[in-house]
Curated annotation (Swiss-Prot):
Glycans are attached at residue 458. Hyperpolarization-activated ion channel that are permeable to Na(+) and K(+) ions with very slow activation and inactivation. Exhibits higher selectivity for K(+) over Na(+) ions. Contributes to the native pacemaker currents in heart (If) that regulate the rhythm of heart beat. Contributes to the native pacemaker currents in neurons (Ih). May mediate responses to sour stimuli. GO terms for cellular component: axon; monoatomic ion channel complex; plasma membrane. S-palmitoylated. The gene is Hcn4. The keyword Nucleotide-binding applies. Homotetramer. The potassium channel is composed of a homo- or heterotetrameric complex of pore-forming subunits. Interacts with PEX5L with a 4:4 HCN4:PEX5L stoichiometry; reduces the effects of cAMP on the voltage-dependence and rate of activation. Interacts with IRAG1; regulates HCN4 channel activity. Interacts with IRAG2; regulates HCN4 channel activity. Residues 105-118, 1122-1134 have a biased composition (Gly residues). The chain crosses the membrane at residues 264-286, 294-314, 337-359, 379-399, 414-436, 492-517. Keywords: cAMP, cAMP-binding, Cell membrane, Glycoprotein, Ion channel, Ion transport, Ligand-gated ion channel, Membrane, Nucleotide-binding, Phosphoprotein, Potassium, Potassium channel, Potassium transport, Sodium, Sodium channel, Sodium transport, Transmembrane, Transmembrane helix, Transport, Voltage-gated channel. Residues 26-36 have a biased composition (Acidic residues). Coiled coil: none annotated. Disruption phenotype: Hcn4-deficient mice are embryonically lethal, dying between embryonic days 9.5 and 11.5 due to a failure to generate mature pacemaking cells. Conditional deletion in the adult heart results in cardiac arrhythmia with recurrent sinus pauses, bradycardia, and atrioventricular bloc. This is Potassium/sodium hyperpolarization-activated cyclic nucleotide-gated channel 4.
Length: 1201
């Protein structure tokens, strides 16, 4: 303001006359700053501002201005004292006009008195801003301060003036003094001009400060405070401050309904009303003397509080319905209260009974004491009942408190409602009980009232109250009449009144309780209503019972008895709160999923916010192979099976995900996924998937790498993914740390797949496995004939064979596998692994000691298939090297057996040794890591026969020729003609020529006639030449090595030799052993009934499907020997002569055989022949217990001999 020109300042000073009172106050504040600066303003401006005051004479004013303008130095030196006097005088004049800025100007003036004028101006403005910011505008109550105190600072100011003025060295000093005097006189004239008032100014100032502090504190209690309830009601702290300003501007002593004062006052009145409504009925009814001192004091104090409350209601703001507006205008408050509850509150607050007693006692004491005493007492008691009208006030306050609790705590609101309802019912019962006794008491207890009948007129008030309350509650609950039925007319009417009131209260209580219970569990009620609609829908469309049950189960698992509109609930929340809730709901999914555990938390949050919850039932196909993929899924709970066309099945459990491959390649589904249990999944759409991965390229790379690894595990490839991953690796987009994270995610995914395989293998293991010897019966063409032969009848002699011995064959269409696929069926493999490795051993399982088709045949199964690379951890190394006598042979291991046992200690060693090198000849890239190192030629040579052993001779060996000489070439796996991508189906490995095997020592006499004209088994590739990478040559023969007791197919089917038999395992009672002679006769019957094999049957056998290579199908083709040679024992047939099981017969296999039912070549005799070129099969035999007795090898019968 000091920098403004005088004309502009004059215009600003004239603004309060044109604007309202608020602008006047603001102008005074600004002018107060100038006055505190040292008195440089013209005193004539003060006359403009104080227009109601008589202005000084113009000559004096002109002299003042001239003196100030003539001597500026004297003004500066005298400025502090003069400014203190001026600001104090004018400031106090302004203060009682309603401006709080006068305090700041006074403080600034006093501060300026201690220093220069500029310092005083700075101190004044800072102090003024601090006071205004702390207290706001002045309350209207300050306008009522007595004006006589306005001259309070005048005496100190005038006293300070001579002290601050130097001796009369400057001529303008008297003019300055004369300039000061009119201002002071003017101020005194305004405030009354009394000289005596100057003597009491210091005490008045102290009183004013104390009263101002108390007034401010009490005024703050009348305003709404910044608490939880106020913030919830008004929305923000700024809104609460605006409401406080409304209270200040509304007038003097206006109480806000949400203020702290009103809160505590209502609480006090609530407790006082409850006490009155309980004590007053008891005192009126059961106590005759009401003029005792305690009773009078209680009534007087209560009436006084209620009268004060009546007055405060005129100054308390009224809340309009629905909290839309709060009325703070005093006139509107008064009119609204007078029209509503004023009459009731006034009557209940006035002590009418005491007023009546005072008036009556002054009329005539003698009359009062005699004739009118009883009537006056009765009327006084009736008038005292008017205090019970305070119940209306109690109901209003309780309702207000319910609103407060409802706005603050929802659960507390429900509890308060129930407590209020119960309390009101008990209060009505209390009143009704007092009424039941009050009516007979006012009638002076007539003879037919219930009090006289029961003889309780002179009893204690406690006993009278108890029976009266019992009678009232019996009426109100409609359960009786108390001790007896009413007799008098007054009792009858009272009983009817009690019944009506009680029935009303009972209905209200039931209704409120029901509504409260429903409100406490609204989600369950909503679910029940929804499911009723579903039941009506199913009935309307007449759905079958199975479908209805599935719908019921789905609703139970999906909603679990509670239904929420989760999308709308989350949509109404803020984004940070919504993300926090979603992260909490999906915490189990994140904890069980390695992908999220190794990912960026921002990526996890972005992914979770876009997930959608879904539930699938067992048997539901979540995705189907060949369809267009629009979603991927994350498993929270449940187990799913991943199925491909090659029957390659994989299990996925909690924490896994699937369906991301087609989202990455924008192609079609590569596999089908079926739910095995109830699955709770989270789905992610393709749009959201791409949106998230655009922000996190490293996670896209992780998804692509895991997808490639999964495709490789199921034997498929995707060039698009391979090209993307290879491009990222070559370009070096990701650093070392990111690549490590991606590799860790891939390793976790593999581990989860292996865990799922272990769970599946454990689940498929049964206590009594189905004999696998009967599996080919379903797949063979002569199924019906085999089922009716005596072989089946003979085998059914054993009581331990399961009923479901014929199992259905696997589905057709399994031969169309890609070049990179692993041709094996995990389900078939896992059903064989536990039975072969653990549960099929006769010694380890007592329930199977007498089963003819047990562990030894499972070893044959293990010898005829290859396992995918992911299954090597499933094969326990403890069962890979059994003792030599596991199948009846003496404990003298051969060198090749020891070599195989040593090699089988690794994860996949016993499978590789059993297959005899078929893995090494396969071109499948998936099996490359599983191939062991090169083996020595000695390991591929057949072992010599054990001197004391049975030699492993069985029934079938009597139909076979002796092994060929060393000139007979052996067959290599490559000469079977399979493509490079498929696994080799042959079981022989090693050099092209196999050393000559030793001769068999003996042949059983009862089968001697069946060996004539027999020739070795030979296999001829259809193409004539081997594929590239294999040694070409003419058709090779598989030499028939002498069978060992180690687990070859031949040894499994041959009867025991004449060597000393080992100790027999004791059989169960009532189970006769099967004799070899009977089995031999049954075998002759079957083998004689079968036709001969055609020559070109090898064309079909060479293209055996990958699935059939894992099955133990006993069908095979027999061909003439490629080259002649003298066998070491027994006569050989002529060259080129085909032979069957019986001389002169040809065993044929039908040409039209599906790939799913084709047996693998060498499934029986091939394994026997392979035993001469590979390690023994004892590595796949089950482990026996240390103390278990060995069981002799029983003959096993193939189904299509």
């Amino acid at each position: 303001m000091d920098k403004l020109p005088p004309s502009m300042r004059k215009r600003l000073y004239s603004l309060p006359q044109q604007v309202g009172a608020k602008a006047w106050i603001m102008d005074e504040e600004e002018d107060g700053e100038e006055e505190g600066a040292g008195g440089r303003q013209d005193p004539s401006r003060r006359s403009i501002r104080l227009r109601p005051l008589p202005s000084p004479s113009p000559s004096v004013a002109a002299g003042c201005s001239e003196s100030r303008g003539a001597a500026l130095g004297a003004t500066e030196s005298e400025g502090p004292g003069r400014s203190a006097g001026k600001s104090s005088t004018n400031g106090d004049c302004r203060r009682f006009r309603g401006s709080l800025a006068s305090l700041g100007s006074r403080g600034g003036g006093s501060g300026g008195a201690g220093g220069g004028s500029s310092l005083g101006h700075l101190h004044d403005s800072a102090e003024e801003r601090r006071l205004i910011a702390a207290e706001g505008d002045a309350s209207p109550g300050e306008d009522r301060t007595p004006p006589g105190l306005a001259t309070e600072p005048e005496r100190p100011a005038t006293a300070a003036q001579p002290a601050a003025s130097p001796p009369p060295q400057q001529p303008p000093q008297p003019a300055s003094a004369s300039c000061e005097q009119p201002s002071a006189d003017t101020a005194i004239k305004v405030e009354g001009g009394a000289a005596a008032s100057d003597q009491i100014l210091p005490e008045a100032e102290v009183r004013l400060g104390q009263s101002g502090f108390m007034q401010r504190q009490f005024g703050a209690m009348l305003q709404p405070g910044v608490n939880k309830f106020s913030l919830r009601m008004f929305g923000s702290q700024k809104a609460v401050e605006r409401e406080q300003e409304r209270v200040k501007s509304a007038g003097f002593w206006i109480i806000h309904p949400y203020s702290d004062f009103r809160f505590y006052w209502d609480l006090t009145m609530l407790l006082l009303m409850v006490g009155n409504l309980i004590i007053i009925p008891v005192g009126i009814t059961f106590f005759k003397d009401e003029n005792t001192t305690p009773w009078i004091v209680f009534n007087v104090v209560s009436d006084t509080f209620f009268l004060i409350d009546l007055v405060l209601n005129f100054r308390t703001g009224i809340v309009v319905e629905d909290n839309t507006e709060i009325i703070l205008d005093p006139q509107r408050i008064k009119m609204k209260y007078l029209k509503s509850w004023f009459v009731v509150d006034f009557i209940s607050s006035i002590p009418v009974d005491y007023i009546f007693l005072i008036v009556e006692t002054r009329i005539d004491s003698e009359v009062y004491k005699t004739a009118r005493a009883l009537r006056i007492v009765r009327f006084t008691k009736i008038l005292s009942l008017l205090r019970l009208l305070r119940l209306s006030r109690l109901i209003r306050y309780i309702h207000q408190w319910e609103e407060i609790f409802h706005m603050t705590y929802d659960l507390a609101s429900a509890v308060v409602r129930i407590v209020n309802l119960i309390g009101m019912m008990l209060l009505l019962c209390h009143w009704d009980g007092c009424l039941q006794f009050l009516v007979p008491m006012l009638q002076d207890f007539p003879h037919d009232c219930w009090v006289s009948i029961n003889g309780m007129v002179n009893n204690s008030w406690g006993k009278q109250y108890s029976y009266a309350l019992f009678k009232a509650m019996s009426h109100m609950l409609c359960i009786g009449y108390g001790r007896q039925a009413p007799v008098g007319m007054s009792d009858v009417w009272l009983t009817m009144l009690s019944m009506i009131v009680g029935a009303t209260c009972y209905a209200m209580f039931i209704g409120h309780a029901t509504a409260l219970i429903q409100s406490l569990d609204s989600s369950r009620r909503q679910y029940q209503e929804k499911y009723k609609q579903v039941e009506q829908y199913m009935s309307f469309h007449k759905l079958p019972p199975d479908t209805r049950q599935r719908i019921h189960d789905y609703y139970e698992h999906r909603y679990q008895g509670k239904m929420f509109d989760e999308e709308s609930i989350l949509g109404e929340l803020s984004e940070p709160l919504r993300e926090e809730i979603i992260n909490f709901n999906c915490r189990k999914l994140v904890a069980s999923m390695p992908l999220f555990a190794n990912a960026d938390p921002n990526f996890v949050t972005s992914m979770l916010t876009k997930l959608r919850f879904e539930v699938f039932q067992p048997g539901d196909y979540i995705i189907r192979e060949g369809t267009i993929g629009k979603k991927m899924y994350f498993i929270q709970h449940g187990v799913v099976s991943v199925l491909t066309k090659g029957n390659k099945e994989t299990k996925l459990a909690d924490g896994s995900y699937f369906g991301e491959i087609c989202l990455l390649t924008r192609g079609r589904r590569t596999a089908s996924v079926r739910a095995d249990t109830y699955c709770r999944l989270y789905s992610l759409s393709v749009d959201n998937f791409n949106e998230v991965l655009e922000e996190y390229p490293m996670m896209r790379r992780a998804f692509e790498t895991v997808a490639l690894d999964r495709l490789d595990r199921i034997g498929k490839k995707n060039s698009i993914l391979l090209h993307k991953v290879q491009h990222d690796l070559n370009s070096g987009v990701f650093n070392y740390q990111e690549n490590e994270i991606i590799q860790q995610i891939v390793r976790h995914d593999r581990e989860m797949a292996h865990c799922a395989h272990r769970v599946q293998a454990a689940a498929s293991a049964t206590p009594t496995p189905t004999p696998v010897i009967w599996t080919p019966l379903i797949q063979a063409p002569l199924q019906a004939a085999a089922a009716t032969t005596s072989v089946a009848i003979a085998l059914t002699h054993h009581p331990r064979l399961p009923a479901a011995i014929f199992r259905p064959p696997p589905g057709p269409g399994l031969g169309n596998l890609g070049a990179g696929q692993t041709p094996r069926h995990p389900r078939r493999l896992q059903s064989l692994i536990p039975s072969a490795l653990g549960s099929a051993s006769p010694a380890s399982s007592p329930s199977q000691v007498d089963t003819p088709s047990s562990s030894s045949f499972h070893i044959q199964q293990l010898a005829g298939f290859s396992a995918p690379p992911g299954l090597s951890p499933l094969l326990p190394s403890s069962s890979s090297s059994p003792p030599p006598g596991a199948c009846g042979s003496p404990p003298a291991p051969t060198p090749s057996t020891s070599t195989a046992a040593a090699a089988s200690t690794t994860g996949f060693g016993h499978f590789h040794k059993a297959l005899g090198g078929s893995l090494s000849s396969s071109d499948s890239p998936l099996l490359t890591p599983l191939q062991p190192g090169a083996r020595s030629p000695q390991a591929a040579q057949p072992p010599p026969p054990l001197p004391g052993a049975r030699g492993g001779l069985g029934l079938l060996e009597h139909f076979l020729p002796p092994p060929p000489s060393s000139r007979s070439p052996s067959s290599s796996p490559g000469q079977l003609g399979q493509p490079p991508g498929e696994l080799s189906l042959g079981l022989a490995a090693g050099p092209s020529s196999t050393p000559e095997t030793p001769p068999r020592p003996e042949r059983p006499s009862f089968m001697a006639g069946a060996s004539g004209g027999a020739s070795p088994v030979a296999f001829t590739p259809r193409g004539g030449l081997s594929p590239p990478g294999h040694s070409p040559g003419p058709p090779r023969t598989f030499p028939s090595a002498p069978p060992r007791a180690s687990g070859s197919h031949g040894s499994l089917l041959l009867p025991p030799a004449s060597s000393p038999p080992p100790p027999q395992v004791p059989q169960r009672r009532g189970t006769p052993p099967l004799t070899p002679g009977r089995l031999t006769q049954d075998l002759k019957l079957i083998s004689a009934s079968q036709p001969a094999l055609p020559q070109d049957g090898a064309q079909t056998l060479r293209r055996a499907s990958p699935h059939s290579s894992g099955e133990s199908v006993a069908a095979f083709s027999l061909y003439p020997r490629a080259g002649g040679g003298s066998g070491s024992s027994g006569g050989l047939g002529p060259p080129g002569r085909p032979y069957g099981a019986i001389p002169g017969q040809h065993v044929t296999l039908p040409r039209k055989t599906s790939s799913g039912s084709l047996p693998p070549p060498l499934s029986l005799f091939g394994a026997r022949a392979a035993s001469s070129g590979g390690p023994p099969l004892t590595t796949a035999a089950p482990q026996r217990e240390p103390g278990a007795r060995s069981e002799p090898v029983r003959s096993k019968l193939p189904s299509n001999l």
